[in-house]
Amino acid sequence: MGLCGLLERCWLHHDPDGVLTLNAENTNYAYQVPNFHKCEICLLSFPKESQFQRHMRDHERNDKPHRCDQCPQTFNVEFNLTLHKCTHSGEDPTCPVCNKKFSRVASLKAHIMLHEKEENLICSECGDEFTLQSQLAVHMEEHRQELAGTRQHACKACKKEFETSSELKEHMKTHYKIRVSSTRSYNRNIDRSGFTYSCPHCGKTFQKPSQLTRHIRIHTGERPFKCSECGKAFNQKGALQTHMIKHTGEKPHACAFCPAAFSQKGNLQSHVQRVHSEVKNGPTYNCTECSCVFKSLGSLNTHISKMHMGGPQNSTSSTETAHVLTATLFQTLPLQQTEAQATSASSQPSSQAVSDVIQQLLELSEPAPVESGQSPQPGQQLSITVGINQDILQQALENSGLSSIPAAAHPNDSCHAKTSAPHAQNPDVSSVSNEQTDPTDAEQEKEQESPEKLDKKEKKMIKKKSPFLPGSIREENGVRWHVCPYCAKEFRKPSDLVRHIRIHTHEKPFKCPQCFRAFAVKSTLTAHIKTHTGIKAFKCQYCMKSFSTSGSLKVHIRLHTGVRPFACPHCDKKFRTSGHRKTHIASHFKHTELRKMRHQRKPAKVRVGKTNIPVPDIPLQEPILITDLGLIQPIPKNQFFQSYFNNNFVNEADRPYKCFYCHRAYKKSCHLKQHIRSHTGEKPFKCSQCGRGFVSAGVLKAHIRTHTGLKSFKCLICNGAFTTGGSLRRHMGIHNDLRPYMCPYCQKTFKTSLNCKKHMKTHRYELAQQLQQHQQAASIDDSTVDQQSMQASTQMQVEIESDELPQTAEVVAANPEAMLDLEPQHVVGTEEAGLGQQLADQPLEADEDGFVAPQDPLRGHVDQFEEQSPAQQSFEPAGLPQGFTVTDTYHQQPQFPPVQQLQDSSTLESQALSTSFHQQSLLQAPSSDGMNVTTRLIQESSQEELDLQAQGSQFLEDNEDQSRRSYRCDYCNKGFKKSSHLKQHVRSHTGEKPYKCKLCGRGFVSSGVLKSHEKTHTGVKAFSCSVCNASFTTNGSLTRHMATHMSMKPYKCPFCEEGFRTTVHCKKHMKRHQTVPSAVSATGETEGGDICMEEEEEHSDRNASRKSRPEVITFTEEETAQLAKIRPQESATVSEKVLVQSAAEKDRISELRDKQAELQDEPKHANCCTYCPKSFKKPSDLVRHVRIHTGEKPYKCDECGKSFTVKSTLDCHVKTHTGQKLFSCHVCSNAFSTKGSLKVHMRLHTGAKPFKCPHCELRFRTSGRRKTHMQFHYKPDPKKARKPMTRSSSEGLQPVNLLNSSSTDPNVFIMNNSVLTGQFDQNLLQPGLVGQAILPASVSAGGDLTVSLTDGSLATLEGIQLQLAANLVGPNVQISGIDAASINNITLQIDPSILQQTLQQGNLLAQQLTGEPGLAPQNSSLQTSDSTVPASVVIQPISGLSLQPTVTSANLTIGPLSEQDSVLTTNSSGTQDLTQVMTSQGLVSPSGGPHEITLTINNSSLSQVLAQAAGPTATSSSGSPQEITLTISELNTTSGSLPSTTPMSPSAISTQNLVMSSSGVGGDASVTLTLADTQGMLSGGLDTVTLNITSQGQQFPALLTDPSLSGQGGAGSPQVILVSHTPQSASAACEEIAYQVAGVSGNLAPGNQPEKEGRAHQCLECDRAFSSAAVLMHHSKEVHGRERIHGCPVCRKAFKRATHLKEHMQTHQAGPSLSSQKPRVFKCDTCEKAFAKPSQLERHSRIHTGERPFHCTLCEKAFNQKSALQVHMKKHTGERPYKCAYCVMGFTQKSNMKLHMKRAHSYAGALQESAGHPEQDGEELSRTLHLEEVVQEAAGEWQALTHVF
């Protein structure tokens, strides 16, 4: 504590220890006190020598050398003292440096700060700054010791000495367990009198300029330190550094005792104090791995699992600080320490000053005096005598005489609020407050306190606070907690307490200069001011919407992300903002507070005016709205709000924002703000064009449209245009004769409510006369004044003073008979009309309690109350007919709705009066004597209550569904089961109609009504009456019409048994039976409240047609809670036990857990599933579980054939066939066949819905309903038609259909056994044209095919697809085995880039391609054929094959070329390839031959090559056909590697293997190759198949004889296999669209083979390379037993066929997969599903037929797929071929192994990495097929070769 602070207190206060207080005249401090020790420096006197000596030592330690002789300030620099002395001059304040004069001393003080020199003393050695010379001297001594030599560092705790400071620090850690502190030691009482840097805003002084700079940022809001990662700004560099740790994840502060690490040093200190400090009381649990100590075993287990389980080091979370605070809150200090601290606190001279401040605070904070014997209300605001804009702390300081401190709180201070125990357990706060307010009360309380409380109080230390802190301070374990004087909250920082106190005082010192709003915290004001500037600097990255503050942006972003961080503590709902949650939480307490009557009130006092009432003050009703359902009268807004708030229907928690001009309250502050403008006349939203002001932005937007001249709302009748929808709606009244608004006084009708209201003002004089008559009658009889005024409360201006109700709900619950003694005046407004709202104008005796018991004690009291109720008066004339039923839904209601009152009373009375109401009665079956409350409400009705039967069903519905109808309307108290229903109902009160019709502008309350209305515009009347053929637009209109044809009259009058078709007619009739006073019947109020019932009953009638189930008996919340506590006896029935179980599970919620998290939490058992990571205790459980994976259902029902996985399910199912229902419900006597069905049914009675949707707040009775509901959350988007895509070097282009394929040619005829044949022009199809388009084509009379490729048809095309329609078939074409509907087109694709180049080079396609003479192609790369050379391609389609193949990125190019006319193409290596182009001049087929594609090649050179390759046996036509396998690798080409004559563009090429058989050389030297896999080619599996023959050596190499190959010497003709290999140079590839065969010279040495050859034939298992694919296949079979030799280079997956590999490779490429582009021509006859392959269709068909052709030989199980059988067989063999590469686990399926590796070893990341970086050689690859060798094997060995590929 500084000297100046001591002097300040000494001069301002009287200290009882002897320090005298100076009077005002003692200005020069020259006073004399005898026998006192006087200080010569400060002239203070002390009675004792010890005090004087201590005081002098303070001078020596804290004084600066230069002292002011007129005040206690001292200075280190003499110049600063000179400047200071000029402030004491009494004359004009003048600066001694610049001689500038000032009018005020304060201005001079601020000015001389510019001239002051640095006061701090700087160390010349290290530059450290010090305030006092003594501090500098101590510091310099350290430097001298360092220079002198070694220094001994002594431990202050144990006096040990160490040579280095690091050793001392290590040693001090041993004392940390005892002397650790979680907070820094601050000097709470800083002497700021000597600080020279003053804040210009608040006057606070600081020692350093840097401190002042940081402080000023609090006032200016400047945040210069911005985060580079997220843009967040801070006002201090240290805060930014702390924030950056969140991004970096750095935790530099490591605990020395355990592995924990922290980002902040304070968290580390708190951690050390919490887990490493000594625990004095109670058991402790020590960690075996580190030195952590815990008080509970659970904390130790949590610590071990986090820190010592080998996982990542989980440092203590950010919430650990909060746990530290909670843990240390009630830890006690040693008694000696407490006493010592208390003694030191009392010895301080400032204790009296502190007590004065606390006294002032408590006086200011005392609530207003309340009546004796009553405690202040919980919600009552504290009456504070401070000004509205002043801080209570500031006022207390001023009253106590201390210097004031700034009240502005630091906006950036974090509030470490800490809620302590309640006052009963925390005597600290109460003791302080009692001591200060009333000592006598405090003594009495101390006498009554128990010894335990006294012990607790002794263990805790209470210190009085400093002058700056209100309330008390509780210090615990070195932490000072500042207790709020109003509540039990505690804070570490005084500034946090100051801000918190404003919550209680409602002080908002920070006012907005531009509007009326004020705020408690300056940061909130700063954010608010940004809304006035119009600057919206924060933009949403999703929708680009801008916001003025970052907080608003954060809340908005939650709309996009769906984050709802604020959860309700009472239910499962979550909210985006805390304000929404706060509003929602109030709804939980709203009804309970109303029921419990927490806000007690006195009986209502009604003050009625004595003199004439002015006409404008007469309240008018709202116009009656005429609808199809009846007459509806809306609530008058002024009467509703007045009654609503005066009668306390709304609690403060629900509508916290109240208008201080009127009684209205709102849920949101923005609504209040807009409402207040109606009082103040403020219109802040100005139109920039005309200057008009508006109260809201929405009205301004609508107004701006009037300036634009845009009239977007048009009348459909007269074409008139209007600016707004309201103008159009008003205009539409001209075109119709509807007059829906009726005056409630004279029944005159109007088109608009505005005109009706104008008319209704003419009735005010009549109403005023009636009111005067009513007042005169009221003054005659004083005994009935209260009751009459209650009836007129909604028709006149009254003032209701509410204080308290006679009894609370708790008292009523304890003594239900008290409800019977209520006087009528206590039940505010329970007139007959109010009951009529809910009970359809029944007499008051028709109350709910008639359902309880015939001998109800309440009936007499109700009858007595009815006799006391006078005849109702009304301001309306008697002209309103009886037939009108007017809804007056609110202003006639009592304080509590009458039905609600009677429901509460009936429940309480029935519980109290029924002798059978006990725990066991709820379980007993219903009987005449003992039955539960719910059953009695249903079953007991007698002839005495016949008048209630009409409303019984409605009454039951309200009673039974009360627990489920939790959403209540604030206007009429009607209950709903869903919030959406309530929302729609509220619109009937507010008049909101958000759903607008686009055609006529009418608004509707729901989208369903709008949809029905829109049908009226279409004129379509789809609903016809089957009796009279009348048509209606909606189903509801038809339903109402059908009632006219029905002779049934289901609605019976309970008085005369007359029947009616509708409830409306029945209720109108029932009114005739009612005996009510004439005055009551004369008013329109008797019918008031009827429409709500009519609407509700009609709605229930409509729902009755949908639900045929009878009414369900439902237990109330109290009954269910009582049932849950019951333990049923052993003799109880199954139904009774199930009822108790269902009641107990009502609050249980079964949520869907994350599967992976659930598997991790579950314990591991010995019986593990081989398909998934689950494990089970019993082998039988595992067997049942495995059936989920295998799909096995061994238990089959003999009755219906249904199969089940478990036998118990079959047993339950069989009971449904027998009809036995052994389980009966004792509540409603319904019977069920299984116990599970009974359990589900019992939830209807208890209302239990344990199954909660994880995506919303809905709950369901069964998991199946939840599952069905969850499907709505995953509803897929409507499937879009997939557009055909083409992979090419450019983008995928959409085809344009230019051909009408639906037309047919009369010359086409279809025969069953014929083959498609025809003549095609060889020049029609050009080499190198690959793409996609549909071109028109036709067939001439001679059978020639003509395709017209004109410039006009190609001008707008990017991709061209050649499509041959059905009408293109010539007269000699025959079709067999093909559906005529499937031959609409034959697709050949042309690459768009090639087409473009072709058009540019030779204008090839500009002419008509036809077979007419005189037309020849002009392309130099294409040669005309010799017509004398026969050439043909014979195509025989397989059975059921559709000739509609879409060959993706390829085409089949055919053309006749002789040997002399061959096209020469030159590659980069200098070799010339002879392109052999084969022709397609006819489609012929031998009858009965296999379905295959035969290529007859007439080129002599190719024939010779094939003949030599085939060997001598090949010429024999009688031998077996030889097969040639053409393997085309997937290679890439670039434009640079293509020959100059080839117009090809780069494209991705796929792989295809063709198995062809050679039947020998024909007589014309031609060789025929037959392609067996026609389906693979025609379904789009081919890209480009090239057969090249080099010009150098036109011979195939000799047959390779490998002794290792099996089957070579076998019988049968040898077969020729042409094996491909990768070319040495990628540029040698010529991507021609033709069948080419490339041979390699037979003299090719093995050393000259390409280096990539090994990779092309490399074993996937052992990485061994082979020279050919055949050798590799043989090796894979013999060594590894596998046939999958085609491996993916990316993911190493293996396939049997190259086509499968090709399809798989598409998964590694971007864009649609190849399989998705294949045409799905094979359709299922049952479900119309289509497939690309017949095998897929065959497998699919087994689903419908139930065929299971694959049988297990060991257990006779059958499966519909071979793969399922293979998986099943592994169960018998126990084989687990797929081993995990990281652990020893094995799996039967590779997918399970991958799943295991992803979960257990995080293999997914590595897999993605490898997939994202496939190995590339860096060279461009070619797809040209180089046939390297011919391998001869026996034909039998290669029979399965076609299946492999």
From Swiss-Prot:
<feature type="zinc finger region" description="C2H2-type 7">
    <location>
        <begin position="225"/>
        <end position="247"/>
    </location>
</feature>
<feature type="zinc finger region" description="C2H2-type 26">
    <location>
        <begin position="1657"/>
        <end position="1680"/>
    </location>
</feature>
<feature type="region of interest" description="Disordered">
    <location>
        <begin position="864"/>
        <end position="890"/>
    </location>
</feature>
<feature type="zinc finger region" description="C2H2-type 25">
    <location>
        <begin position="1251"/>
        <end position="1273"/>
    </location>
</feature>
<dbReference type="Pfam" id="PF13465">
    <property type="entry name" value="zf-H2C2_2"/>
</dbReference>
<feature type="zinc finger region" description="C2H2-type 22">
    <location>
        <begin position="1167"/>
        <end position="1189"/>
    </location>
</feature>
<feature type="zinc finger region" description="C2H2-type 13">
    <location>
        <begin position="566"/>
        <end position="588"/>
    </location>
</feature>
<feature type="zinc finger region" description="C2H2-type 17">
    <location>
        <begin position="741"/>
        <end position="763"/>
    </location>
</feature>
<dbReference type="InterPro" id="IPR013087">
    <property type="entry name" value="Znf_C2H2_type"/>
</dbReference>
<feature type="zinc finger region" description="C2H2-type 18">
    <location>
        <begin position="967"/>
        <end position="989"/>
    </location>
</feature>
<feature type="zinc finger region" description="C2H2-type 24">
    <location>
        <begin position="1223"/>
        <end position="1245"/>
    </location>
</feature>
<dbReference type="GO" id="GO:0008270">
    <property type="term" value="F:zinc ion binding"/>
</dbReference>
<dbReference type="Pfam" id="PF13912">
    <property type="entry name" value="zf-C2H2_6"/>
</dbReference>
<dbReference type="InterPro" id="IPR036236">
    <property type="entry name" value="Znf_C2H2_sf"/>
</dbReference>
<feature type="zinc finger region" description="C2H2-type 27">
    <location>
        <begin position="1686"/>
        <end position="1708"/>
    </location>
</feature>
<dbReference type="GO" id="GO:0006357">
    <property type="term" value="P:regulation of transcription by RNA polymerase II"/>
</dbReference>
<keyword id="KW-0677">Repeat</keyword>
<protein>
    <recommendedName>
        <fullName>Zinc finger protein 236</fullName>
    </recommendedName>
</protein>
<keyword id="KW-0539">Nucleus</keyword>
<feature type="region of interest" description="Disordered">
    <location>
        <begin position="404"/>
        <end position="466"/>
    </location>
</feature>
<feature type="compositionally biased region" description="Basic and acidic residues">
    <location>
        <begin position="443"/>
        <end position="458"/>
    </location>
</feature>
<feature type="zinc finger region" description="C2H2-type 14">
    <location>
        <begin position="657"/>
        <end position="679"/>
    </location>
</feature>
<feature type="zinc finger region" description="C2H2-type 23">
    <location>
        <begin position="1195"/>
        <end position="1217"/>
    </location>
</feature>
<keyword id="KW-0862">Zinc</keyword>
<feature type="region of interest" description="Disordered">
    <location>
        <begin position="1267"/>
        <end position="1297"/>
    </location>
</feature>
<feature type="compositionally biased region" description="Polar residues">
    <location>
        <begin position="1286"/>
        <end position="1297"/>
    </location>
</feature>
<feature type="zinc finger region" description="C2H2-type 1">
    <location>
        <begin position="37"/>
        <end position="59"/>
    </location>
</feature>
<feature type="zinc finger region" description="C2H2-type 29">
    <location>
        <begin position="1750"/>
        <end position="1772"/>
    </location>
</feature>
<keyword id="KW-0238">DNA-binding</keyword>
<dbReference type="GO" id="GO:0000978">
    <property type="term" value="F:RNA polymerase II cis-regulatory region sequence-specific DNA binding"/>
</dbReference>
<feature type="zinc finger region" description="C2H2-type 4">
    <location>
        <begin position="121"/>
        <end position="143"/>
    </location>
</feature>
<feature type="zinc finger region" description="C2H2-type 20">
    <location>
        <begin position="1023"/>
        <end position="1045"/>
    </location>
</feature>
<feature type="zinc finger region" description="C2H2-type 3">
    <location>
        <begin position="93"/>
        <end position="115"/>
    </location>
</feature>
<feature type="zinc finger region" description="C2H2-type 21">
    <location>
        <begin position="1051"/>
        <end position="1073"/>
    </location>
</feature>
<keyword id="KW-0804">Transcription</keyword>
<feature type="zinc finger region" description="C2H2-type 16">
    <location>
        <begin position="713"/>
        <end position="735"/>
    </location>
</feature>
<feature type="zinc finger region" description="C2H2-type 19">
    <location>
        <begin position="995"/>
        <end position="1017"/>
    </location>
</feature>
<dbReference type="InterPro" id="IPR051643">
    <property type="entry name" value="Transcr_Reg_ZincFinger"/>
</dbReference>
<dbReference type="GO" id="GO:0071333">
    <property type="term" value="P:cellular response to glucose stimulus"/>
</dbReference>
<feature type="zinc finger region" description="C2H2-type 8">
    <location>
        <begin position="253"/>
        <end position="276"/>
    </location>
</feature>
<feature type="zinc finger region" description="C2H2-type 5">
    <location>
        <begin position="153"/>
        <end position="175"/>
    </location>
</feature>
<feature type="zinc finger region" description="C2H2-type 15">
    <location>
        <begin position="685"/>
        <end position="707"/>
    </location>
</feature>
